[in-house]
Design a protein with these regions (language model features):
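N-proximal low-complexity "stem/linker" segments adjacent to membrane-targeting elements
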Residues: 1-19
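Short, solvent-exposed loop/turn segments at secondary-structure junctions
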Residues: 11-14, 39-42, 56-59, 106-109, ...
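Short, acidic, metal-binding catalytic loop of nucleotide-sugar glycosyltransferases
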Residues: 22-32
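Active-site-proximal specificity loops/subdomain of glycosyltransferases
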Residues: 38-93
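GT-A fold catalytic core of metal-dependent nucleotide-sugar glycosyltransferases
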Residues: 83-128
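Short beta-strand-to-loop element that shapes/binds the nucleotide-sugar donor at the catalytic cleft/hinge
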Residues: 124-141
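Catalytic core and acceptor-binding pocket of nucleotide-sugar-dependent glycosyltransferases
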Residues: 145-289
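C-terminal non-catalytic accessory extensions
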Residues: 265-322
Length: 322
């Protein structure tokens, strides 16, 4: 597969498992990651992760220079709305790439080429519908689809002049996906990621139904994720048989994670369970030993999330947040 460039502007401190994210990038040499950040800590960046250090003010100026109106980019989180425009904003960095994408850093990638092939990039204008990871074919027309009107008005201008977040990068609520559809562009909506449901202390997967256009949350089951030399898999027992499914990536949804590994660099294999990265206890998973593999740690994720959301609602109500 020819190179795909993932663009990541990130301001603030990367999460505590960022080295594991980088390790998963290193195992995908067909892709590059272009990171723009003010976090100057000394990480072991692999050869396919190119870092450009800059302040958020410099990023604001870069984005503003691409538009002839005043943009509402006051906080780093607002960059989410600008993700569909990265092919235009960062165009000078994308020469020679077949495709470009945006992704978050609360992911651990599996083997990308097993899920996004050269043929996929030829067949689709856009692969994915979510802000946490989406790939676009890289050409001048495709990189400017976000500029197209929606229902007779300039949706992108409406979003980019407002300081509030509009989720312009995902789903179908007058978003970039809606614009791609209205322009007759081809979108691959099939999901291959493990998207962790936020409102559970366990690892329940949530998936998007492209027909009903809503989320479905799976029933809770005892399962573990294992990242092994670049391949991300989920294991569980069903009707007495060991089941295994590979994934493009696992998305933690900004979930706090503990690290119980001796190292996070040049690691060959680790287990991912609520809410911990740790070594796998066995050499090979089997029906006989699966019950003895730890599948979770007690955590207060759900209760902390409820408290956080309540506090955000209170701040919005009294005008301290937007």
């Amino acid at each position: 597969m020819k190179k795909v460039a993932f663009i990541i502007p990130y301001f603030g401190r990367f999460n505590n498992y960022f080295p594991l994210f980088l390790e998963s990038c290193a195992h995908n040499p067909d892709c590059d990651w272009l990171i723009f950040t003010d976090d100057r800590r000394a990480f072991s960046y692999p050869a396919n992760v190119i870092v450009h250090y800059m302040s958020f003010a410099e990023m604001q100026a870069m984005v503003q220079s691409k538009f002839d109106f005043s943009i509402g980019l006051e906080r780093p989180y607002k960059l989410c709305d600008f993700k569909p425009a990265y092919g235009y904003i960062f165009e000078e960095y994308l020469t020679g790439y077949t495709a470009w994408g945006h992704c978050d850093t609360d992911l651990i990638f599996g083997r990308i080429r097993d899920f996004i092939s050269e043929q996929d990039i030829r067949d689709y204008d856009k692969i994915g519908i979510f802000g946490h990871c989406t790939v676009f074919r890289n050409d001048e027309e495709n990189n400017r689809i976000f500029l197209q009107p929606l229902n007779g008005h300039s949706r992108y201008r409406e979003v980019y002049t407002d300081r509030k977040n509009h989720s312009f990068d995902e789903e179908f609520k007058d978003s970039i996906n809606t614009i791609f559809e209205s322009c007759g562009k081809r979108i691959r909506t099939t999901e291959y990621q493990a998207n962790i449901y936020t409102k559970s202390s366990d690892f329940r997967l949530t998936s998007w139904d492209p027909v009903e256009r809503c989320y479905h949350n799976e029933k809770l089951k005892r399962a573990i994720f294992v990242w092994d030399d670049g391949i991300l898999s989920r294991y569980w027992i069903e009707r007495g048989e060991l089941q295994k499914q590979e994934y493009l990536y696992i998305h933690m949804q900004a979930r706090p994670m503990d690290i119980r590994l001796e190292k996070m660099e040049n690691v060959q294999r680790f287990k991912i369970i609520p809410n911990t990265f740790e070594a796998l206890e066995v050499e090979e998973i089997s029906v006989d030993n699966f019950a003895h593999i730890r599948s979770k740690y007690f955590n207060l994720h759900y209760f902390r999330l409820r408290s956080k959301n309540l506090w955000v609602k209170i701040k919005k109500k009294i005008g301290l947040a937007y």
